[in-house]
Amino acid sequence: MHEYSIVSALIEQCEQHAKANRANKITRVDIKLGVMSGVEPALLETAFETFKLDGICRDAELRMTLQPLVIACLDCHQESELTERSIVCPACHSYHTRVLDGEDMLLMQLEMEQEDEH
């Protein structure tokens, strides 16, 4: 499961942002997950719940926004938004398409707090 390595990198990125902002607690992590990212949302959530236990994200809620696949057809010039992993143009059924969005997983926002250490 590559979701474990993805979550490990995500938590590391969260920790870097928290340190840069002098926060010692992250309460929410918002990500955008593309349909073609190759990441399974349920497995990602399970991995996050497992890995967050040791560290600054231990109380964090993971919020995922699923980004549909956006393609441009190079034959009929139609732009389409798809919710399935397909690069076929729904208008003309051409495979001659270009992916515009929906391939990535992005950290969109963090909700952080500064707590007293006493």
From Swiss-Prot:
Q: Which residues bind Zn(2+)?
A: 73, 76, 89, 92
What keyword terms does UniProt attach to this protein?
Metal-binding, Nickel, Zinc
Q: Which GO terms describe its molecular function?
A: nickel cation binding; zinc ion binding
Which residues does the annotation say bind Ni(2+)? 2
The domain of life is Bacteria
**Pfam families for this protein:** HypA (PF01155)
Kindly give the InterPro entries that the UniProt entry links to this protein: HypA/HybF, Multihaem_cyt_sf
A Gene Ontology BP annotation from the UniProt entry: protein maturation
NCBIfam families of this UniProt entry? hypA, PRK00564.1
Tell me, what does this protein do in biology? Answer: Involved in the maturation of [NiFe] hydrogenases. Required for nickel insertion into the metal center of the hydrogenase.
Protein family per UniProt? Belongs to the HypA/HybF family.
UniProt name for this protein: Hydrogenase maturation factor HypA
Its organism's taxonomic lineage begins at: Bacteria, Pseudomonadati, Pseudomonadota, Gammaproteobacteria, Alteromonadales
